[in-house]
Amino acid sequence: MTQKTIVMTGAAGGVGTLLRPRLAGRYNLVLSDRGPAPDDLRPTERWVTADLTDPASLAPLMAGADGLIHLGGYSIEADWDTVAAPNIIGLQNIMAAARDAGTERVIFASSNHAVGFYPRTRRIGTDEAVRPDSFYGVSKAFGEALCSFYADKFAMRCMSIRIGNIAERPADKRRLAIWQHPDDLAQLITIGLEHPDIHHAIVYGASHNERAWWDNGAALALGYRPEHSAEDHVDHAMAEQAKLGPNAVGDLFQGGTFCAADFSGDVTRSLNARLPRP
Ligand code: 15L
């Protein structure tokens, strides 16, 4: 059987770099970012330089693609214009290019920051209202809505993965709850690209974490079986945590320092709020 052709945006970034060796044997990868091609392309990888804010560069990128893994865009908090150009306008540009190219599958790299203002004492699934903790988180909530729209309106099949933190091991105490090993993310992406019954799935990008704040039943129902556990790295994570000072706001909410930045809210009200289900 011929291998599927899958476009990966943001391929030069940290997550893309960790995913490439894990997906290159399974798909023909069309890697893309704003800069020039790296010098380590594998035989099943090719490179297309493109910019999410330049629609003319996206049509040639998406031509012939069976699927899109969209990691591109701004990946941390910034002022609204900086986030919105790639993550709002740019996201619609790449979705439109995918639709025009007849690409059926989209994996959208959403983020835990779409729900970052849930207290750490709450266990949440994917059927609760979004609670973004930053302009960045708002852009990820928008992205989930856009994927839902493309699935309903144009019959595309999308998976929004609310990624926790992708690394070889969890970096601190917060990451013990939200960490995902790159092997497990690659497994989840493969499910999103291949499972026959996906319309728009929202799942958490997390490994098997004892301290998880999330009910990842939606991913498990699709066959996701994470092989890594944050608790195996607890000594490392806690040693790193000890180097960080306490954060009066960030330590209460799932989004951590993203919640604390520029915070002038009411902690008690946010902790106790019960939002209506969407
Ligand atoms: C994210 O969504 C960011 O892209 C990444 O840089 C980390 O900050 C991660 O969340 C996290 O919450 O650890």
Where are these regions (language model features)?
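Conserved Rossmann-fold NAD(P)-dependent oxidoreductase catalytic core, especially the SDR/UDP-sugar
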Residues: 93-131
